[in-house]
Amino acid sequence: MTQQRPTRTRERKKTWTAFGNLGRKPTDYEVVTHNMNHTMRGTPLELSPTVHANVWLKKNRDEIALKVDSWDLFRDPDRTTYDTYVKMQDDQETYVDNLLLSYTGEGRYDEELSSRSLDLLSAGLTPTRYLGHGLQMLAAYIQQLAPSAYVGNCAVFQTSDALRRVQRVAYRTRQLADAHPARGFGSGDRAVWEKSPDWQPIRKAIEELLVTFEWDKALAGTNFVVKPILDELFLNHLARLLHVEGDELDSLVLRNLHGDAQRHARWTAALGRFAVEQNVNNRTVLRDAIAGWHETGEAVLAAGAGMLASRAPSADAAKIADEVRATLAQLHANAGLGHDA
């Protein structure tokens, strides 16, 4: 009688081994994001280690003070993917298109805007095409050096949002130029951006950020200080003032764009919190980096709040500045970087 050999059960390798021991099936968000940054290795790019791009990545990303063992553990609180982003922003663009059609499709909406509304628009809206391009380049740099696709994707969607903002401002600029050719909408905006005293502290801040190359310092200066101040000034507070002056269209468009800024603040706070949870020393690193931009942020805030208040009788520069500081403090607290943390 021959004995049958016992059948050996072969343990099947899990499909999602790259995720480690998740204990669950990864989400669609994780599948299309996890471990997608191909530069996180000894030599970032498949070129000579001495090639400028490799030296740059090593110096400005891999050798910075902000340290986390695995950036792939970070998660965007909104779990945004390309698919969900496109659908979400398609809805937002449809909303803005309908606003424009509703207000300016027929009648003389722009021609009937008050002089105070036009003053606010020429000072604080149409020159922001240049500001938006600066913010777009800053977000793109944060994305390029991001140590994980989970982080980089957040920044790339922020980059796209900045372009959306530029496009919407440019569209309104053209409409306002047609309605008020003597006002200099469009034709005079570059001079305002480059020469108006109100804008120079802001322009200086953007230009200084554009030559800040260490990733942690660029992130801190952009997303933890300068950008949130600018978003509150020229999206939130400008929207409020235009509403008071009777320009409901531009107020609503800016409030819609402010929704993008709030999403940027969510992922920024989540990233700060994650970095501190992964390495307690990162709290000091980020606080120091933020402190390095404090004086610049205050100059931006004083210039922007003064610009808006000088063109709207209902506004008070000190009150605007205090409200923006409170929003900024809340962002830092949400990131685990507040004074009580």
Curated annotation (Swiss-Prot):
Q: Which family does it belong to?
A: Belongs to the TmoE/XamoE family.
**Assembly:** The alkene monooxygenase multicomponent enzyme system is composed of an electron transfer component and a monooxygenase component interacting with the effector protein XamoD. The electron transfer component is composed of a ferredoxin reductase (XamoF) and a ferredoxin (XamoC), and the monooxygenase component is formed by a heterohexamer (dimer of heterotrimers) of two alpha subunits (XamoA), two beta subunits (XamoE) and two gamma subunits (XamoB).
According to its UniProt record, the EC number is 1.14.13.69
Question: What's this protein's function?
Answer: Component of the alkene monooxygenase multicomponent enzyme system which catalyzes the O2- and NADH-dependent epoxidation of short chain (C2 to C6) alkenes to their corresponding epoxides. Also able to catalyze the oxidation of a number of chlorinated alkenes, including trichloroethylene, cis- and trans-1,2-dichloroethylene, vinyl chloride, 1-chloropropylene, 1,3-dichloropropylene and 2,3-dichloropropylene.
Q: Which organism is it from?
A: Xanthobacter autotrophicus (strain ATCC BAA-1158 / Py2)
Q: What top-level class of enzyme does the UniProt entry assign? A: oxidoreductase
For this UniProt entry, what's an example GO CC term? cytoplasm
**Where found?**
Cytoplasm
Designated name of the protein: Alkene monooxygenase system, oxygenase component subunit beta
Activity regulation, in the record's words, is: Inhibited by propyne.
This protein's gene is called xamoE
* Induction summary: Induced during growth on aliphatic alkenes (such as propylene, ethylene and 1-butylene), epoxides (such as propylene oxide and 1,2-epoxybutane) and chlorinated alkenes and epoxides (such as vinyl chloride, cis- and trans-1,2-dichloroethylene, 1-chloropropylene, 1,3-dichloropropylene, epichlorohydrin, and epifluorohydrin). Repressed during growth on other carbon sources.
Gene Ontology molecular function: any one: alkene monooxygenase activity
The protein's matches in InterPro entries, at most eight in alphabetical order, are given as: Ferritin-like_SF (IPR009078), MP_mOase_hydro (IPR012078), Phenol_Hydrox (IPR003430), RNR-like (IPR012348)
